C-alpha cells in the first residue's frame, strides 16, 4: 500500500516501514527529536518554516531542513518520524504539528505521569467489628515494633510493594484501646482480641495527649512527650538500651514513678524537661521530631473575643527558639512529614493548611472543602497524598504537590450512628490503615501496598477488554471496562499516557463511565478507534488524548467489533448489521451506510481480509461472508451444520422474527436486557447442553492474511463455545473444511485468537485463562504446499513438546490429532483471556484478561512481566528476540499457587522430571553371585527368615464382594438430554417401629417436684452434702412464742414418720 507524500515531489512513503516486516537494524536509532534539537536549531527551523508558503513543508523538504541542522536519519527511521509528526494525515507538516511532536516527547518522559493511580486511594471496603468495651473507646494507641522515624543516613528509596510479612506481630505491632471506665484491650494487627487489663490513676493536671519518638537502632535517646489540660508540655528522655528504666525488677509486677522524684533526679535513667504554660489552653496534640530535634505542640483557641485570631495555634520549639504558627481558632491535629520538611495542620476552622517547617509566617497551601472541623490529618509522603477527616466523619484525600482533591469518602457516615460524635482516630503508617474507634472498631486501608507474594499488580482498574500493538510508535495500547485507555512502553515497562473517562453517559445528572468493548488502529496506525457498550464510537489521537471524531451505530447497542480500512470504518454489534462510516476528508460527517441486514441475532465478532472480504458471526452461530468493496454477502453458514448450503435470503419465520424483534426493541428502548458476550467469563461448572435445539455461539473469528482465496486453502478460523475451532475457505465456492478441539477442559472455549505475520502459528486465549500455540503451516492447505517440519527445532523453542514420563492432560487430548500441532499450552491468567496479540520481531505474546492484567510472554511461554507492575522491569528491545536460555524466569505469584506440572515446566523453562531407570532383569546365576557378594545387612533372607503368610495385613476391614446380580442400566439416549431421575430406583419409606419407653423414664416423667420440696429455715452446710441441712440454734424456748407454735404445727402436720425427702434419700 503506497501513499503520496507531497504535492510538490514524487516521493512515496511505504506502509511497509511501520510494519514488522522490516529486517533487523544493526543499531537502534532514536526518533526523539526533543533530545537532538537545541534552542538555536529550533529557532532556525522556525524561521525556515515561516519562509515556506503556508508555513508547510513536505516529506523531502522536512528532511532537508533537518539535514541543514546536522540531524540525520536513515530511510526507515525517517519514514516513521514523518508519520508521527504528520497528525493531520495530509502529508504536509506545519509548525504547530512539529512543535506538538516535541512537546509530546517531553511529556512522555515526565515522571509524574507514572505515579497517577488507576484506582481511588480508598477503594477497599472497610472492616468493622465490635470494641468489646462497656463504653465508648476514648483512646487508640499502637504498640509499635518499628519506629516511624528513621535516621537520615538510613533512609532508603521507598517502594510501593511488600512481600506479605508486614502484617505479622513482629513487624506491625499491637493495637491498644482504652475506654472511660479504665479498661484496656490489646488487639493484633488484624483486630483480633488478645487480652484485657484495667488502670486507675489520678493527677492534678491530667495528661491529655502523649507522643513517643524513638529510633530502631537505639543510639539516640527516646522521647516521651506529655501534654496536659493546663497547657504544659513535659518530656522524658531516656536511653532504650536494655529497656532503660523499664527493666523488670524481681518481686515487682508494676513499676510506679512519681513525677516529683523524676524532677529531683532520684531516677537517673530519666532526664526530664518541662515547658510550663507553653499554651494558654489545653494541649491538643504533641510530637517530637528526632530528625529536626524539635518539639511540636498545638492547642485550640475557640474564644475569639479573648484572643482575636492572634493565637499561636502551633508552637515549634528547637533548642531555645520558638516558632509560632498562627492559625485562627487554633489547631486540633497535625502531622509532620520529615522527608518533605512540611507540617499539615487542621483545626475547627475547617481548613487544612500545609506549612514549611522553616517558614511559620504563612502556609504554603490551604485546602478547602470540609464542612466541619478537622479532627485528624496524616500524610503519605511516598504517595504524595494528604488525608483529612472532619467532625462529620467525611474523609478527603488531597494531592500533596498539586493541592487538588482526589477523593471524598463518606462511608463512615453509614457505618457510625449519628449520635456518636467523639471518635478516636489513629493511622498505622506501616500497614497504611486508618483505625476509627467508638462503639465499633473500623479499619480503612488507605492506598495499600501491592502484595507481590500474591500478585504482580494490575494493568487496569477493571477487566481488560482489548490489547493492541502499534507498529508506528512501537507501544502497546490497552482498553478496559473501566473506560480507560492506557499507552505503555513495553520495552521499559513505563506507562506513557493514561486517558480516563473515555466513554461516558449522563444519567440523572450523574456521569457514568461506559465500558470499552472494541478497538483498532487506522491503516497508518496514527489514530485509535474505540467502540463502547452504549453504541458510541470515538476516534482518538491517543498521543495527546484528544477526541477527533464521535460516531454511533445505534443507541444502547453494544459495539462488539470495529474494522478500519482505507477510507472506510466498519462497525458491528448488537444492531445485527454492519454500519459503514466514511473516512474521506470532507465526507466524514455524512450519514453512515447500513449494509443489508441478514443476521437474525447479535453479532459477536468479525474480521477482515484486506482487499477481499469481511466475515461476521453471531451469537446463534450464523456466519456470513461479505464482499469488502461492495458490501454484498456471498456465502452464509451455520456452525451447527456447516456443510449445509444456506440461501442468502430471509425465511418467512426469520422475517416474522425480525419484525417481532423490531417491535420489542422499540418498546424496551434503553432497558434492553444485557446478554453475556465473549468478555464475560463462563463458569467452569456451567451445565449447558449442546443439543439439537440449543444454538452454538461463535466467540471469535480470524482471517489468515497470507493464504489465498482458493477452495483448497482454509483461511478463516472460527471459534465456538463448545471448545472447537472450525476452518472455512472464504472462496465463493469454498466452505467448511475441518475442525479441531482447542481446549483440554470441559466447559472451556477460545475467546480470542491472533497469528504471526507469516501465519505459521495461531495463538489462542481461552475462558479458563490458558494460552495455546498451534503450528498451522501444513493445516488445511493443498498437499503440494505442505513443507517438512523440523521437530527437533520446535522442541528447542517450545519446551512443551519435550517428552515426559507421564503424558499430561493437554497432550492426551490431542494425542490422536496430527494437524494442527499443539506446540505450547500453559495457564497465563486466573480468569478469562479477552484479547491476545503478537509482536513479530521480538516474538512476544501479550494477553489482556478479566483479572485486570495484561501480561507479556515469549513465544515459548516464558513470563516476561505484567504491565503496571511495581517490580523492576526486565529491559526488552523491539529489534531483538525476547528471552534467552541462560535467563532465569519466574512465575506469576497467582499462577504459582494453581499451576499444573505442564504450566510450571513451560513458564519456568525447566523440565525437572526424568524417566526412572528400570532395573535390569538378570539370570538366576548372576543374581546368586551378586547376593553372595552383598553385605549381610542387605541380605533379604536374613531380614525375613521365612515367607510371609496370610493374612499379611492382619485383622482389617475387607470390602464387601460384588453382587451376583449384574444391575445394568439402559440409558435412553434418543433425546438431546438424558433424564436421569427416570432411571433411578426409588424405594418407598416404611413406618419405623417405636421402641417402648423404659419404666424408669416413665416413673420420673410422672413425678412432681413438689412432693420432694421441704420448706426449711436455716443455713446450708457447704462442707457436706447439699441435703445436709443444719437448723439454726435456738437461744431460748418460750412456750408462747408464735415461732415455736408454727414449727410445732409444721412438725405435727408432717407426722412422726420419716419425711418424703428422707425416703427418697
Swiss-Prot record:
Residues 915-936, 1024-1065 are annotated as: Disordered. Residues 926-936 have a biased composition (Acidic residues). The keyword Repeat applies. SUPFAM superfamilies: EF-hand (SSF47473), Soluble quinoprotein glucose dehydrogenase (SSF50952), WD40 repeat-like (SSF50978). WD repeats lie at residues 153-197, 326-365, 369-408, 459-498, 511-550, 598-638, 745-784, 828-867. InterPro entries: EF-hand-dom_pair (IPR011992), Quinoprot_gluc/sorb_DH_b-prop (IPR011041), WD-EF-hand_domain (IPR051242), WD40/YVTN_repeat-like_dom_sf (IPR015943), WD40_repeat_dom_sf (IPR036322), WD40_rpt (IPR001680). Residues 915-925 have a biased composition (Basic and acidic residues). Keywords: Repeat, WD repeat. Signal peptide: none annotated. This is WD repeat-containing protein on Y chromosome. The lineage of its organism: Eukaryota, Metazoa, Ecdysozoa, Arthropoda, Hexapoda. The gene is WDY.
